[in-house]
């Protein structure tokens, strides 16, 4: 498959464009470089704030939250909204967004809102103005900030969404129902860890595909896929899926191997072992016994194996 396309805040390793003229080195961004195509953007530079610049903040006013530059008194709200609207209307499609946390322009949800221009208390948290435009124009695009992505579960969820949606984008180009059916079959187990009911509804959609125009089915499937993947995978559902997969090979394993898997599953349930360890075990047995149905399941490797260690590291 082609590399997924990720929108990224330019200050995260691409240019020294922060308000203080600095660049931020981010390990996760660096690990992704071989596997994704980055589209860097700095919204604050694009609206002419310059580098370095006087800091901006979001200020709550009687007219709503405004993006203000206290040192100059400049109200940057409309300029940023205009840039965001134009950017997301004209930019090509992308598979995810990785933005700068707490930035008044790019923060996803943790941007401080102040009661006044200077020496004023924080009264709320919100999304940055550019990030809000992203959510309005591209609501199905997985979007995270580098702060939240220090969490292993959030990293895994983000990468699943990005790589799955990129795979579907390639599948959807031809609008061929046979390709969508194959896609759904390969993603069944992964989707079950997010929402079994959504997986079954998507299965009914493709099964009845002959009653509708193929393009309509493909578009509806894409919407359902994005909604299903937006739900974080549930541990209980993941354990059930792993047990189901284990059932395909368990009768051909030794007693010691079965015991090892079940004890590993319990350690995963207790958050003492990463999911990748169990998937690696299953992959080895699937290859050993040539279990073709399981070999095609994307859950076993939803993103490049080289990123497993990145996902498993940290908290």
Where on the chain are the PLM-derived regions?
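A charged helix-plus-loop insertion that forms the helical arch/lid used to bind
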Residues: 57-74, 112-124
């Amino acid at each position: 498959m082609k590399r997924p396309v990720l929108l990224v805040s330019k200050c995260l390793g691409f240019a020294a464009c922060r308000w203080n003229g600095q660049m931020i080195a981010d390990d996760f961004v660096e690990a992704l470089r071989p596997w994704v195509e980055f589209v860097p953007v700095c919204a604050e530079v694009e609206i002419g704030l310059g580098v370095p610049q006087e800091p901006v903040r979001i200020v709550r006013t009687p007219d709503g939250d405004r993006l203000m530059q206290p040192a100059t008194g400049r109200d940057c709200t409309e300029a940023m909204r205009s840039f965001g609207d134009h950017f997301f209307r004209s930019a090509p499609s992308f598979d995810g967004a990785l933005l700068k946390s707490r930035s008044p322009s790019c923060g996803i949800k943790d941007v401080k809102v102040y009661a006044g221009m200077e020496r004023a208390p924080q009264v709320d948290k919100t999304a940055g103005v550019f990030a809000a435009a992203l959510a309005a124009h591209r609501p199905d695009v997985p979007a995270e900030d580098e702060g939240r992505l220090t969490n292993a579960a959030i990293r895994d969820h983000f990468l699943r969404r990005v790589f799955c949606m990129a795979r579907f984008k390639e599948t959807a180009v031809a609008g061929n129902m046979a390709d969508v059916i194959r896609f759904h079959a390969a993603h069944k187990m992964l989707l079950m860890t997010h929402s079994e009911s959504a997986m079954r509804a998507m299965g009914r959609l493709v099964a009845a595909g002959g009653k509708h125009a193929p393009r309509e089915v493909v578009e509806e499937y894409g919407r359902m896929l994005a909604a299903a993947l937006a739900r974080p995978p549930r541990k209980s559902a993941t354990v059930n899926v792993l047990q189901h997969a284990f059932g395909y090979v368990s009768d051909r394993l030794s007693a010691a191997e079965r015991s090892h898997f079940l004890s590993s599953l319990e350690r995963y349930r207790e958050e003492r072992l990463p999911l990748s360890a169990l998937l690696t075990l299953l992959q080895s047995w699937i290859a050993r016994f040539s279990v073709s149905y399981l070999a095609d399941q994307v859950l076993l490797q939803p993103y490049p194996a080289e990123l497993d260690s990145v996902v498993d590291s940290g908290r």
